Regions:
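Flexible helix-coil transition and linker loops at the boundaries of alpha-helical arrays
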Residues: 36-48, 84-104, 126-127, 143-154, ...
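Amphipathic alpha-helical repeat scaffolds of TPR domains
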Residues: 44-67, 93-123, 149-169, 191-205, ...
Length: 335
């Protein structure tokens, strides 16, 4: 749960970086029913389909209000257990609106973890079934893609979920190979900003399944596409593009090249995610395992520039490396 929570927090930070100015409105039952009529009469009204899909998820998960950055504010278990929540499930099950399906699916997956955390912090006798919600979320996004296979937005919703299902989710788990098969298909559809924002996900997973040529192509494209330092994803692109190329070099026994890419990754300007959660330490760990302590120590010093919220971890790791011990990088091997 902790790792899933971190993934959701990263998504929240991404949303904030994208500067979504208006919070999503949590609608009443009557308002949702009126919106259903609107969407039925105007199937091309994407904004209404988006709002309806998200509010379907809010009923299923019992979300009564949202706070800053659209995080769960309050829960109402009776809302999730009511007749209208069952109506919502039925509507999702028979919907032919890709927008409603994709938006409800993405919201169900995202908010299920927030609901789990909320229920842990605010225990009540009534529990909301988040497992069923996550399963429905996966199914809904898959159906949206089958209805509109060329819509890139739906693919960007699915890619992070596929990776989570292959890493730490107990909901419809996948092997990394299975996940990469679908991620590669999704990437083949994406263009422009949608593709740019997913390249690091695809590159990291390609390394994991030893598809090194694919990983290199994604990483090179990521670096070449990073031309605007004002873009919220610029720092991530510099970091992960170089990290993946370093991982590939190391797997191909080019240790000096791998070290150069490690140090290049550490020169990133940072990003909302890197500044909060810190860097992925996979390449650093791999180089430590080959005895390359000095390069890793320099890299850790580089990371101090952007990771001010490390709570002493960079120094702790440096001390352990200097003592010839392998640090426990924990969740910094997953980001």
């Amino acid at each position: 749960l902790a790792v899933r929570q971190i993934a959701i927090l990263a998504a929240v930070i991404t949303a904030a970086a994208n500067a979504q100015p208006q919070p999503t409105e949590v609608l009443s039952q009557n308002q949702v029913q009126q919106l259903e009529i609107t969407v039925e009469r105007n199937p091309g009204d994407r904004a209404s389909a988006t709002l309806l899909g998200k509010n379907y998820a809010f009923f299923i998960l019992g979300i009564a209000s949202l706070g800053r950055f659209d995080r769960v504010g309050t829960l109402d278990p009776e809302k999730a257990a009511g007749n209208f929540a069952q109506h919502v499930r039925n509507e999702i099950g028979k919907s032919v609106s890709a927008g409603v399906l994709a938006e409800s699916g993405q919201a169900l997956w995202r908010y299920a973890t927030e609901v789990k955390v909320y229920q842990t912090l605010h225990p009540t006798p009534a529990k909301i079934d988040t497992t069923a919600a996550e399963t429905l979320g996966i199914q809904s996004i898959d159906r949206a893609i089958s209805l509109e296979p060329d819509e890139g937005t739906w693919r960007t919703y699915r890619i992070p979920i596929l990776i989570q299902r292959s890493s730490f989710s107990r909901i419809k788990p996948l092997s990394a190979t299975e996940a990469y098969r679908d991620v590669k298909e999704d990437m083949s559809v994406l263009t422009g900003t949608n593709r740019y924002n997913m390249l690091s996900h695809a590159a990291k997973l390609a390394v994991k399944v030893s598809e090194l040529d694919d990983a290199g192509s994604y990483a090179e494209e990521l670096l070449k596409s990073s031309t605007d330092a004002r873009n919220w994803n610029y720092g991530n692109a510099i970091y992960f593009g170089n990290m993946v190329l370093g991982q590939i070099a190391l797997r191909r026994s080019s240790i000096d090249t791998a070290k150069a890419y490690l140090l290049a990754s550490g020169k990133t300007l940072g990003s909302p995610q890197l500044n909060s959660f810190g860097p992925n330490m996979s390449l650093a760990k791999d180089l430590l395992e080959t005895g390359e302590r000095q390069a890793v120590l320099i890299f850790l010093d580089e990371c101090r520039v952007f990771w001010k919220m490390d709570n002493g971890r960079l120094q702790q790791w440096a001390d352990q490396v200097n003592s010839d011990r392998m640090p426990d990088f924990g969740s910094n091997l997953l980001y």
